[in-house]
Amino acid sequence: MVWQGLVLAACLLALPSVTADCLAQCSLCAVKTQDGPQPINPLVCSLECQAALQPAQEWERCQGLLSFLTPFTVGLNGKEDLKSKTVLEESSSEPAKHIRPYLKELEKNRFLLSTPAEKNALSSSLVEKLRGLSGRLGEDAESELMGDAQLNDGALEAEARDSNEEEPKEQVKRYGGFLRKYPKRSSEVTGKEAGEGEGGEVGHEDLYKRYGGFLRRIRPKLKWDNQKRYGGFLRRQFKVVTRSQEDPSAYYEELFDV
């Protein structure tokens, strides 16, 4: 009785896995033959797979279809594996080319060296070489990045320089369309020197006539004693003394004498 119970329990435990396999295979066969003239019924196929129905025509057809499809699936999986392997080999080929000579040297000298001190010295030298190689590879990548960054910075500087050169051209043209640069007048220089020497008095400023494109220097006012402004008859060399500058007491004395 005990053996019979154990066999029954093993059969019950094995049934779900067998059922799942049959359903998966029959479903695949049904999908492959659904557009054909005689599609496979997945329910009948699964029952025949479990030996619940006789004869097993649908299951035999499904087995023939699966045996025909398995070589192609295996070939496709093999091609995908080969592609992945080639990609990995190509990605790791460049560092391997540089490191391979050092590994060969290590394997060759492993049998020649007898003392552990020599082995340690050789291993340390190889480690330093490998570190230098990895540093050079990293520096090459960094140099490429820095070169690209410098090119971008150079382009930006050139654009900024062009914009600065264009700014004077965009200035507004004044007074007849000419923008001229005039030198400093000597009178301004002398006026500044006189102002510094006499306590801040600034000399006369040059006047500029801006409406015709001409720059003219206006003379300062003539310091005459009495200047007639309407006809220009009174001039500097006549030495006319005005009445306001005379002594008023002398005028009153003349009146009293009369």
Swiss-Prot record:
Q: Where primarily located?
A: secreted
Q: How is it modified after translation?
A: The N-terminal domain contains 6 conserved cysteines thought to be involved in disulfide bonding and/or processing.
- TM ranges are none
Gene Ontology molecular function, alphabetical: opioid peptide activity
Propeptide per record: which residue ranges?
21-172, 186-208
Supply the InterPro entries for this chain: Opioid_neupept, Proenkphlin_B
> What does the UniProt keyword field contain?
Cleavage on pair of basic residues, Disulfide bond, Endorphin, Neuropeptide, Neurotransmitter, Opioid peptide, Secreted, Signal
Q: Name one GO biological process term.
A: neuropeptide signaling pathway
Annotated Gene Ontology cellular components are:
axon terminus; dendrite; extracellular region; neuronal cell body; plasma membrane
Domain of life, per UniProt, equals: Eukaryota
Q: Where in the cell is it found?
A: Secreted
Question: Do you know which PROSITE patterns this protein is assigned to?
Answer: OPIOIDS_PRECURSOR
Region forming the signal peptide: 1-20
The similarity annotation says: Belongs to the opioid neuropeptide precursor family.
Q: What does this protein do?
A: Leu-enkephalins compete with and mimic the effects of opiate drugs. They play a role in a number of physiologic functions, including pain perception and responses to stress.
What is the name of this protein? Proenkephalin-B
